[in-house]
Amino acid sequence: MTPHVMKRDGCKVPFKSERIKEAILRAAKAAEVDDADYCATVAAVVSEQMQGRNQVDINEIQTAVENQLMSGPYKQLARAYIEYRHDRDIEREKRGRLNQEIRGLVEQTNASLLNENANKDSKVIPTQRDLLAGIVAKHYARQHLLPRDVVQAHERGDIHYHDLDYSPFFPMFNCMLIDLKGMLTQGFKMGNAEIEPPKSISTATAVTAQIIAQVASHIYGGTTINRIDEVLAPFVTASYNKHRKTAEEWNIPDAEGYANSRTIKECYDAFQSLEYEVNTLHTANGQTPFVTFGFGLGTSWESRLIQESILRNRIAGLGKNRKTAVFPKLVFAIRDGLNHKKGDPNYDIKQLALECASKRMYPDILNYDQVVKVTGSFKTPMGCRSFLGVWENENGEQIHDGRNNLGVISLNLPRIALEAKGDEATFWKLLDERLVLARKALMTRIARLEGVKARVAPILYMEGACGVRLNADDDVSEIFKNGRASISLGYIGIHETINALFGGEHVYDNEQLRAKGIAIVERLRQAVDQWKEETGYGFSLYSTPSENLCDRFCRLDTAEFGVVPGVTDKGYYTNSFHLDVEKKVNPYDKIDFEAPYPPLANGGFICYGEYPNIQHNLKALEDVWDYSYQHVPYYGTNTPIDECYECGFTGEFECTSKGFTCPKCGNHDASRVSVTRRVCGYLGSPDARPFNAGKQEEVKRRVKHLGNGQIG
């Protein structure tokens, strides 16, 4: 029986004795040994040794050749063969993918790697160190950790194994809601310091910044603090009591007025410091923490003060140029009877949120009733759009804080449609096959966390960030079971999928095509519900943000299928279920088009609208917000807030495939402009940290959503 040879890259090829003979002859020529018969004999002996086996490793063959040569009469030939093998290994390594990617990083020539994440400044050493570690982690995971069919599917672009530079090499998870309340009230240990419950709002926000930095260094996705205004309200009370006590000790006549004034100032300063801290931090991942603050539901005066402080600081901007802060992402909750309409007690806070959104794009809004309807309970998204389902502890209490998402695998839907060649039945068959593969890939994320001990991430598992206080040698996997954690199937390109399958009319303009798009997402939802039932894990459907993926999938599909009109011709794929960015509709109709999808993909979603400058037309923006309240759970506002520090222009810079330029003076010096765009769910500063080519093209093609006589 002739064996198969397992090569270094994992491929299997038929065994051929001729290749052994050729390698020995090349070494013989280098050693000036003129004995072809001897070389043929050695090759024959080694071939005989390999017979009868199913599979042999390439290194076994080479070692057998070396042993045979060293026992023969030509020692110089043995030496030449060993040197030849060594030189070949070095040359192969230089040509290898790992070496090429490292060289692309060191020489700053690999644009796709350098611009993969708009939040990472690949020009600085800490980020380069993280990128280098990521290159190695990806390589090792592909070669040694993941099943071969999963790796091949990822490489082809059938699926995308997100964050392969971190997981599964490291036992890390994606995003989470920090149990900040538990940590601050019970105390915790961080590094060498024992942290006691803070005695003021300024101390509480300082500690919060350190918690964010630590947590963000132990996970690879977004870090969210849910209902931060309510969590930190007791520390505002503590500050007030401290200032009141000072006033009484010093016999200040209006002790209450003094305490109020000092508390307002301290709270504003505390959240200013927190915003600066977040935007100047670099985590161990080489980036500013992807952090989100959810707020808006608090009714106490302390919670209201926190809400105002967060919004007024964001409006004020960062530094001498008052730049728009990219982080934290702000998510403002709106609830009827609280802050939704005139007469509601916190309606004034909503007005401040509208002003902030018109000037700084954030906050995005969470519509309370819709969030509960779609996800089962109210909570802030983890990161930019990942939503947890309902989970109750042993006491029957709904718990959100301390929970997390284990990771995402995304499907390339347009590729399936292209492979189906317009045949809908073939599409559904291929989709079911890909779903089997996606589930297998997702299960590797779960398996990677089995047997992992709490000591690998004390801040998460031992000090309360995950809502638990485990011992160092406790297994962490138990806290991810029974739906406590989510794990998500993602998808991209509903728009291109419909085009590839049916062509012709735009999906927006055809009710039947709309129904086809919804049906695809319904099938994905059925799959994750089935997986959840079968495994007990919290499988969910997630509308992938696709900052990098919009470019990668399209690039791979263009190489495979060519430039296909309406599919691969733009250089990017449309984000999840979103309306084509070039389709000119009003914001209300865009909401209506996208509204059917969040209830299906309730593990992750966002809707947004593109607007002109609306700083002097807040009523128009409020009208859209109010419309969204009845239709979608989560809504974002994109509006031009670019600034030129050369000529003073404010508004929207010209977006080209090469970058952004001031329309007034032509300035495109990144150090003399401020450009802010929504990357996916987060904002980014593409002037300083460029988007990848596909995302840049998508941003360039975005049109404003105008109409109904309200906007524009």
Curated annotation (Swiss-Prot):
The EC number(s) this enzyme carries: 1.1.98.6
Domain of life: Bacteria
Gene3D superfamilies per the UniProt record, alphabetical: 3.20.70.20
Record text on activity regulation: Activated under anaerobic conditions by NrdG, a tightly associated activase. Activation involves the formation of a glycyl radical at Gly-681. Exposure of the activated reductase to oxygen leads to C-terminal truncation and inactivation of the protein, by cleavage at the N-terminal side of Gly-681. The presence of zinc protects the protein from proteolysis and prevents the formation of disulfide bridges within it.
Outcome of substituting C662A: Loss of activity
Effect of C680S: Still retains some radical and some enzyme activity
EC class (word): oxidoreductase
InterPro entries assigned: ATP-cone_dom, Form_AcTrfase_GR_CS, Gly_radical, NrdD
Protein role: Catalyzes the conversion of ribonucleotides into deoxyribonucleotides, which are required for DNA synthesis and repair. Can reduce each of the four common ribonucleoside triphosphates.
Name recorded for this polypeptide: Anaerobic ribonucleoside-triphosphate reductase
Species name: Escherichia coli (strain K12)
